[in-house]
Structure formats: structure tokens, C-alpha cells
Amino acid sequence: MTEQTQDENKLIAERRAKLEHIRTNCPANGHPNNFDRKHKAADIQAEFGHNTKEELEGMGIERSIAGRVMAKRGPFLVIQDVSGRIQAYAGKDVQKDLKEKFQGLDIGDIIGVTGQLHLSGKGDLYVNMEEYQLLTKALRPLPEKFHGLTDQETRYRQRYVDLIVNEQSREAFIMRSKVVSAIRNFMVKKEFMEVETPMMHSIPGGASARPFATHHNALDIAMYLRIAPELYLKRLVVGGFERVFEINRNFRNEGLSPRHNPEFTMMEFYMAYADFNDLMDLTEEMLSSIATELCGSPQLPYGEHTVDFGGPYARLSMLDAIKKYNPDNATIQSMTYEEVKDVEFMRDLAKSLGMTVEKFWTCGQLLEEIFGETAETQLMQPTFITGYPADISPLARRNDDNHFITDRFEFFIGGREVANGFSELNDAEDQDRRFKAQVDAKDAGDDEAMFYDADYITALEHGLPPTAGQGIGIDRLVMLFTNTHTIRDVILFPAMRPQAN
């Protein structure tokens, strides 16, 4: 047992003894639930922060606040609520009463205070403790040695402590909530209908990913947590709902990284009588609008860069992007789609770049892997990458002029993918062939290849109008709006490896 652990255990024991004293001597003060908190710290600061000491004395303003004790400075307590901080003043008689009733207050305790509002000699607002209650006795001490938590693992495992002591974390999740609300409002104004589709699928589909598997006992069938809502949302477009969107969780049984969490939030939407160009235009409008609304400017700091959401955003094909970021590679500079279709040529090119090549990779997969290896991380500013090969886009419509590629894009900011969209494949027979090709790929060892979904084919046979659809990764987008560089900083309770003990 470390010295730090011994000290913490001693403090916990002392606080438990105080709680026992409270229960024995003041039963009503064990865990009371009758305090009426009428005011928040930030509202008080905003309303009266400009008043002088004399003005406040003459006004006789009474306020009722409640929150967590974050610091003790002589007779002053710093109380934190959801909106911010304000001080409370405990005179000598109050301090004596607190000592008798509660054996004093500890940092972390939650209290309610009612009293007159005053201004301290240093110019800080405070509430005089005329009426007060200990609402919750904190048995564990808050981190004291640093300004908040510095151990990342502890921050993620004990997010509740992180939120108490780290203002930056609180602000990040407040911004996350605002981003989601702004997206929802934008979509509703564009006449999209919000819907909810199943979270458990009998056939996982809508993306190339490894699913989480479970079993439905009552139905006695295998079920999968959804990897994407796409096929259900497009069924709704078949049914006549021409503009739909959903903000919800997806689950993919894959690795953890600074940009990957197995449980993540996606906003996915579909619009009839539109194509992938309309999606790109809508995305520009949405993100420029949201950045300006929430941050006051479309230019946001991100690390050493400034991301400009104002638009217009760059648009270039995957092949052109590879050429742009490999200017000194003669083979790449002269490469055409005819060569991209040659799997042996692509294998040799990938190996020449030092890449490990999987035996089941197709021409399209090889092109995408080369793009990811040499170009993706260079895309700091908002950029649409188009021209995705059909063999890695089984749900996207083929391009009219070049059937090797599809009318699909992925949207990159900060060197990572944020969104994926395309003109939807609405040819039932072509979709049938592509599903079968995915099954062949799965049999060849690609465990991220899609399953065959016969009911979705049936839906397409009823007729899907020309449609475009897109998914936006909420977590990665919030990372940009909060200037954070790991996805776990914007997910309240991220997936974590089990602790050794």
C-alpha cells in the first residue's frame, strides 16, 4: 500500500466518522432532501457582479444556492454548481454550529445556503450563511495535489471526479451537447424527420465492420448490435419518408485508438431526389452555420492549425489526392485508373511504399490503403475525397462516366475522416450482385465484409427513389469543436481495458 493510499484511507475513515456523528446527533441532516435551490452561481454573478459593495448592502438581496464545496479560505467557502462558482461566508457563530453539528465541512461536501448577497473586500460576491444544510457528506476526498486530475486513465475511469475538478472537461461536454442540439435543429429546419431504428439487428449491415454478437433468448436467434442504421433508414425512404435522420449509437467490435471507440455516436441522414453533390453542399452549409453559431466564427483553433469551416471546401478524387501528397513518386504520378484496376500493379506499389498487404485486398482496397498511408493525415482543412472504388462501396451508386468508381465521398478534417456519404445504389439487381461479392470476400477472410440482406433487396425491388445519404461522426466532430485530440476526451464513459486488480 502506497503512502498516498494510506493517507486517502485515513481521510475516508475520518469522513465516515463525521457522517456517523451526523446520523447520531442530527438524524435529519444525514441525507436531507428538502432544500429549495432557487439560484445558480453564474446567474448571480451575471446579475450582480457589476454592483458595488454599498449598492448591494442597500438592496438587501437574498439568494439560495447549493453545490459542492471546492475550497475553504478562512471563513469563506467556494461553492460550485453546474453553472460556475460563488462564495459563501461562514461567520464565527456559523462555524461553531457547523463544528457541533457536522464536525466541520470538508472539501467535496454538498451544501445548501440561503442568505444576503454581499461583496467581499477583494470584490468577490458571496452569500452570507444565514440558513444552511449539509445535503451530502462526501466520503472520499477530491484530488488536491494538482489542479484537477492529471492521470488520463483515472480521468476516463472516474469521469465523475474529472467533471468535478476539471473545468476543461465540463466545457467539452457542454460543447458536445450544443453541437448535437445545433445539428438536430439544422436538420429539422431543412425538413428532415428524426426517426429511431433498431439497435439490434438480425443481419448486421450498412457498413464494413466487425459486429458485436449476442443471442435473443425468446426468439432463439443470433443478434448483432448495429454497426450502422443505413439499411433501415433507406427502407423508410422506400416507404415514402423522403428526408429522415437519426442521431444514435453505433457499435463496432474493433480496436481502441485516439480516434476509435467501439461505441460511438453517428448522425445519419437520407434525402430523396438528391445526389452526393447535394450532400457536400449541405455539409458545408451545416458546419459553417454551426461553427459560427456556437463559436462566433467559422475559424476554429485545432492544435497548431486553424480549421476554416467557412468554405468552400476542397474536393478532389482519391487518386488525385494520392498524387498530390506523393509528388516525388514517379509511379504514382503517372498512375491511371487502368493501372489501379490491375491488382498485381497495386500490390507491388503498396509493397514499394513499405506497406503490409493482405492477400484478400482488392484493387479498391489497395487504393484506399495507399491513400490512408500517404495522404489522409495531410488533410487538415475540410476536404471531400471523391472517386471511391465500387468494390469498397457496396451500397453506393456507380459513377456514370467511370464504373470502377462510385458517386461517393469521405469528408476529412484534421487528418481524419469525419463523414461518409454517397448517392445511394437503388438498382436492386446490382445491389444483389454486390452483396454476393461481399459474401465471397467474407469467405476469403475479410471479416469486415458485409452480410447478404435479402429483405433489403426486397425493399429495393419496391423502388427506392434517387437518394443520397450520409453519416457524420459526432465524436470526431466534437473533437474539432473542443480542440481535443483523443476521442476519449469527448465520450463521457469511453471503453477501457480492465484494471489489473
From Swiss-Prot:
The keyword Transferase does not apply. Mg(2+) 1 binds at E410, E417. Its cofactor is Mg(2+). One of its GO terms (cellular component) is cytosol. PROSITE patterns: AA_TRNA_LIGASE_II. InterPro entries: Aa-tRNA-synt_II, aa-tRNA-synth_II, aa-tRNA-synth_II/BPL/LPL, Lys-tRNA-ligase_II, Lys-tRNA-ligase_II_N, Lys-tRNA-synth_II_C, NA-bd_OB-fold, NA-bd_OB_tRNA. Binds 3 Mg(2+) ions per subunit. Gene3D superfamilies: Bira Bifunctional Protein, Domain 2 (3.30.930.10), Nucleic acid-binding proteins (2.40.50.140). It catalyses: tRNA(Lys) + L-lysine + ATP = L-lysyl-tRNA(Lys) + AMP + diphosphate. One of its GO terms (molecular function) is lysine-tRNA ligase activity. It is found in: Cytoplasm. CDD domains: LysRS_core, LysRS_N. Mg(2+) 2 binds at E417. Pfam families: tRNA-synt_2, tRNA_anti-codon. Belongs to the class-II aminoacyl-tRNA synthetase family. HAMAP family: Lys_tRNA_synth_class2 (MF_00252). Homodimer. NCBIfam families: lysS_bact (TIGR00499), PRK00484.1 (NF001756). This is Lysine--tRNA ligase. It comes from Shewanella halifaxensis (strain HAW-EB4). The gene is lysS.
